[in-house]
Amino acid sequence: MKKFLFVLLAIVPLAMFAQGFKPTYEEKVVYEGPDVIFRQIDAHTWEGNGHLMANETLYLIEGEERAILLDAGTDIKELDKIVAGITSKPVTLIATHVHPDHTGKSIDCFPEIYINAADMVNVAEMMPNYKGTIKYLRDGETIDLGGRQIDVIFTPGHTPGSTTFIDRAAGYGFSGDAFGSGNLLLITNCSTLILTCQRMSAYMQKYGIQKLYPGHYMGKNVETVERVINLGEMAQGLLEGKYQGEANPKGMLGLNRVLTMHGVRINYGEAQLK
């Protein structure tokens, strides 16, 4: 896990800041501590930014009866107590995907965590010390928080188990790193990403979803249906040989090429061209 986290620390912040994603927030700060800042998106939704991995972001989503926390950041001490200071509702921890900047040490504060089973391949390396119960999400299920429903949509690409969560009534969702926050590390392959982008863009258009809050939120870099469509087209172009991308000799994890278009990047390698 340390090696993987080092890789993320090396390539994600530099690439994102190079793309012009400077943190500029308009949301009101409701909690500020040494490890995380929480800001209020609306009356019952908050986003928290950790300080270790390119503003790794977690989201607290509250209903009338209970709340969910999407991701836990890299290392936020006493995260459970911090969250309890924001909402009085019981909180369930859910991961958008299993990577150490989203399921880091902070998950130890919670007795259980829900993940997409496809990311179990990452658990041994990236959640090695978790003693709680691991439970599985179901594609297409709806999480009822009491007066607020959250749709669960599997969106593989960044990882096999990347998952997006949608509040249809509010017109927005939360996508973790599925669409890259502007800088997508494509760990599966182009074909998988194409299908994910087709599915999500169709869903967003059908239900009028305006934006997806990403896993590294910096205030302006929300995912839109246009961006999702663009990513799918970029992946299709790579697969067909229409786009070649550029060599990225500093790329790690085998992602030694990068395609930059429409203000976003796809990091990929030979293994992803299928």
Name every feature range the model reports, one short phrase each:
Residues 16-29, 198, 202-274:
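Accessory terminal helices/loops
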Residues 20-35, 39-41, 107-160, 167-169, ...:
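Metallo-beta-lactamase
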Residues 167, 184-190, 223-231:
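Histidine/acidic-residue-rich catalytic or RNA/ligand-binding cores of hydrolases
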